[in-house]
């Protein structure tokens, strides 16, 4: 499991610019089910919530992969934390994803990413109050020696949204 954060530096009381998303890479020899989608060995899927898309407000799969594939500089100040998951942790992530198909100012991408990450990881992160990508990025960067700057974002599958997942027409 990877937790990605990106933000634009601003001198404002609350910086809401940026995005937070997760990724799961299948490092096994068999297909894995993540959020109801089957991913093949050696491939990855990204997950995040979005409220600024006319097709759906809530859970999205692979839109971040799509964005970075077609616009490599789409996300600035990108950082990530990474955790190797066992079967029980993957089940906990899937349970969290089943409840995550929503978006609001308080249940935004930062709140979503932190909630799922904190479900399975002992290194807890804090998205702030209100939850923002910049606050979560600062929390990630406080995990000294554990975060990576400018990590690669995998692109293996088409874009889906919702739970259960539906193929996106906008990103087809």
Label the predicted regions.
Residues 9, 55, 64, 82, ...:
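Glutamate identity and glutamate-enriched acidic tracts
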Residues 91-172:
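Activation targets extended, charge/polar-rich intrinsically disordered C-terminal tails
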């Amino acid at each position: 499991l990877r937790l990605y954060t990106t933000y634009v530096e601003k001198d404002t009381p609350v910086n809401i610019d940026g995005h937070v998303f997760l990724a799961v890479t299948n490092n096994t020899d068999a297909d894995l089910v993540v959020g109801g989608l089957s991913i093949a060995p050696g491939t990855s899927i990204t997950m995040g919530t979005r409220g600024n898309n006319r097709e759906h407000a809530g859970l999205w799969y692979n839109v971040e992969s799509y964005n970075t594939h077609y616009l490599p500089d789409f996300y600035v100040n990108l950082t990530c934390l990474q955790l190797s998951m066992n079967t029980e942790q993957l089940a906990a992530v899937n349970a969290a994803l089943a409840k995550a198909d929503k978006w609001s100012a308080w249940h935004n991408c930062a709140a979503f990413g932190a909630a799922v990450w904190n479900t399975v990881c002992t290194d807890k992160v804090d998205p702030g109050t209100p939850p923002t990508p910049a606050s979560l990025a600062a929390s990630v960067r406080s995990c000294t020696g554990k975060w990576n700057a400018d990590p690669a974002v995998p692109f293996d599958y088409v874009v889906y949204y919702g739970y259960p997942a539906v193929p996106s027409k906008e990103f087809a």
